[in-house]
């Protein structure tokens, strides 16, 4: 594990998205947090979210919600993308994302902006994405279950 954390420091030097494969339990969380803490984004927010077991509505809400109407809610009305602005977003279990959510993430990452659903202007975003998967994403791409474009971006 110590060797992986040392390697994380190398990835921290880049601002590119990172994909962590094969780590189970909390190891991927520790690696992602080490990348963030050693990066130039260390003073920005670090947001982690686990996609396992979420249906499409929960995935969309967890990542892209912009409403401030529910301050009592788990996300305080704001999705992980907005919370991670100027910081790092770690998505554990990225293989569990639906294709629709994958395409929304891809569009957000490429445009560096998020279209609001409440008719407000576009929110500019500066988020570094770190994903983790126990499954080889290339296999899922071949099965039509994962976006090849998103795989190339991360």
Describe the role of every protein-language-model region.
Residues 17, 45, 104, 126-128:
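Structural signature of beta-strand start/N-cap positions in the alpha/beta core
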Residues 48, 90-91, 107, 127-134:
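Structural recognition of the conserved hydrophobic beta-strand(s) that form the central parallel beta-sheet
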Residues 70-81, 94, 100, 109-127, ...:
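Conserved Walker
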Residues 83, 108, 153:
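Conserved catalytic core of Hanks-type protein kinase domains
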């Amino acid at each position: 594990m110590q060797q992986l954390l040392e390697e994380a420091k190398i990835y921290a030097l880049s601002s590119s998205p990172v994909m962590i494969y094969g780590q189970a339990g909390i190891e991927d969380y520790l690696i992602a947090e080490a990348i963030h803490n050693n990066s130039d984004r260390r003073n920005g927010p670090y947001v982690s979210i686990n996609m396992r077991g979420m249906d499409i509505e929960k995935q969309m809400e967890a990542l892209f919600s912009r409403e401030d109407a529910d301050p009592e809610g788990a996300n305080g009305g704001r999705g992980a993308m907005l919370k991670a602005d100027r910081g790092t977003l770690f998505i554990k279990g990225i293989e569990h994302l639906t294709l629709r959510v994958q395409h929304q993430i891809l569009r957000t990452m490429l445009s560096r902006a998020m279209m609001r659903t409440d008719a407000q202007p576009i929110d500019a975003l500066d988020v570094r994405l770190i994903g983790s998967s126990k499954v080889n994403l290339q296999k899922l791409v071949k099965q039509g279950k994962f976006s090849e474009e998103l795989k190339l971006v991360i």
